[in-house]
């Protein structure tokens, strides 16, 4: 499965994750509709996803991009990776992500790769388990990323200094 790079606007990176064709049977035959899933990010820690539905693909893509830009969230990153490993579920989809050392690259499959690329992550190990429905994978990935705690947050929560938290 390849992800199409869409034309850039507003400085955002946009990736088309999936296009689904649906058919409604009417008296005169079939009427086709399209549903698309798009992820949008700035490459610096902001990411969002959107779904668009229309009778034609370009209109559905535009609707999805507008929704994705409205639903963007900020994810704190540790340089080019994440702060700690995390597992997250959405529906029957389960994602596991682990920080990786410099030079590893994005080792992830399916829709997870698209989310991580537009987010700006460059080094990560990721695995999806269970359902590979692109919509659920994208939601699980963004859900996991939003629940990553920065060292400052974890230290404040535990009542310790950042150095004590980082030491173990």
From Swiss-Prot:
Keywords from the named record: Ribonucleoprotein, Ribosomal protein, RNA-binding, rRNA-binding
Signal peptide start and end residues: none
GO molecular function: rRNA binding; structural constituent of ribosome
GO biological process, one term: translation
Any GO CC annotation of this UniProt entry: small ribosomal subunit
Pfam families, per the entry: Ribosomal_S5 (PF00333), Ribosomal_S5_C (PF03719)
Keyword flag Ribonucleoprotein: yes
PROSITE patterns on file: RIBOSOMAL_S5, S5_DSRBD
Domain S5 DRBM, residue spans: 12-75
InterPro entries: Ribosomal_Su5_D2-typ_SF (IPR020568), Ribosomal_uS5 (IPR000851), Ribosomal_uS5_bac-type (IPR005712), Ribosomal_uS5_C (IPR005324), Ribosomal_uS5_N (IPR013810), Ribosomal_uS5_N_CS (IPR018192), Ribsml_uS5_D2-typ_fold_subgr (IPR014721)
Superkingdom field: Bacteria
Function: With S4 and S12 plays an important role in translational accuracy. Located at the back of the 30S subunit body where it stabilizes the conformation of the head with respect to the body.
UniProt domain comment: The N-terminal domain interacts with the head of the 30S subunit; the C-terminal domain interacts with the body and contacts protein S4. The interaction surface between S4 and S5 is involved in control of translational fidelity.
NCBIfam families, per the entry: rpsE_bact (TIGR01021)
Subunit structure: Part of the 30S ribosomal subunit. Contacts proteins S4 and S8.
Family: Belongs to the universal ribosomal protein uS5 family.
Name this polypeptide is given: Small ribosomal subunit protein uS5
């Amino acid at each position: 499965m390849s992800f199409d790079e869409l034309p850039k606007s507003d400085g955002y990176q946009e990736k088309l994750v999936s296009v689904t064709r649906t058919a409604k049977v009417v008296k005169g035959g079939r009427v086709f509709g399209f549903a698309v899933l798009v992820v949008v990010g700035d490459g610096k820690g902001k990411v969002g996803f959107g779904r668009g539905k229309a009778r034609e693909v370009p209109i559905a893509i535009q609707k999805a991009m507008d929704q994705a830009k409205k639903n963007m969230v900020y994810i704190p990153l540790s340089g080019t990776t994440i702060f700690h490993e995390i597992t997250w579920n959405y529906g029957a989809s389960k994602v596991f992500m682990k920080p990786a050392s410099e030079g590893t690259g994005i080792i992830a499959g399916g829709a997870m790769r698209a989310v991580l690329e537009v987010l700006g992550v460059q080094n990560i190990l990721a695995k999806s388990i269970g359902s590979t429905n692109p919509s659920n994978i994208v939601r699980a990935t963004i859900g996991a990323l939003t629940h990553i705690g920065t060292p400052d947050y974890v230290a404040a929560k535990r009542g310790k200094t950042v150095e004590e938290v980082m030491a173990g």
